[in-house]
Amino acid sequence: MAPKPEVRRSPVAALLYGAPIGLLGGLIGLGGAEFRLPVLAGVFEYAARRAVALNLAISLVTVVSALLIRGGTLSFAPLLGLVPVIASMIAGAVSAAYVGTALVHRVSERLLERVILVFLVVIGSALIVEAFLPQDVPGLLPDALPVRVVAAVFFGLGIGLVSSLLGVAGGELIIPTLVFAFGVGIKTAGTASLLISLPTVAVGVLRHRKLGSFADRADLTRTVAPMGAGSVIGAVAGGFLVGVVAASVLKFVLGVILIVSAVRIFYR
């Protein structure tokens, strides 16, 4: 059945879906892009390739907004000691995002759906596992700078690939990596994640634009702009409500929801 543009892809619907997704993401410190993708493909009935591109564009809106908000409330001073790690992770992530975006346009829709399914199930499983892990843990990597730099590049490559193939900012991978591998505090990791995500997502969006993903301007006005606005509003509200519900419980529940949604929508 053909989608009903006036209902399924209306700006109001995009806003109303974006807000609760942003709210739930904000409660666990994420932007919610991994939860938007099933909505774009399942509810708004975009093909997988188009859904990934639009999700990435919305992710750019949320990352820029989050950086502006954090810049006015938090200090960037704690990041100074992480500059080599952040720069190395950006180098790897941007390189992989450039290549990954091209792959999105080269593989078949069916193969892309299978790849999306696998990644979403992995991310959902990671959320479930993370719900049972302590937040304050020593970094697994040694303090030797060369080791940390090389590791950051390789981590960045994986993060950039996932970002480009799912259209996500990558916070769901960057933050746990910084916390568990590099021993970074959760708040500092959240800010560093945004700095790493911004160039990664920007490169992906520019590549998608060059490859014609945003040729239909109606997608930008009816879906990207309102869903981006809703996601930002929801994320801000979620930030204020942190602690109302235990993050571990939310991660477990959202992990299960993500896996079920991914299987229902992308398993054909």
Predicted regions and their residues:
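Transmembrane helix boundary and interhelical junction motifs in multipass membrane proteins
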Residues: 29-36, 165-177
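Non-catalytic alpha-helical scaffold/packing segments enriched in small hydrophobic residues
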Residues: 39, 152, 161, 173-177, ...
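N-terminal transmembrane alpha-helices
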Residues: 18, 22-30, 56-59, 63, ...
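Aromatic-anchored, glycine/proline-accented short structural segments
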Residues: 174-195
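Transmembrane helix-bundle signature of multi-pass membrane transporters/permeases
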Residues: 52-63, 190-201
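Juxtamembrane transmembrane-helix boundary motif
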Residues: 1-22, 42-43, 48-50, 69-165, ...
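Alpha-helical transmembrane segments and their lipid-water interface positions
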Residues: 33, 59-70, 100, 200-208, ...
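Alpha-helical transmembrane segments of polytopic integral membrane proteins
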Residues: 37, 61, 100, 125, ...
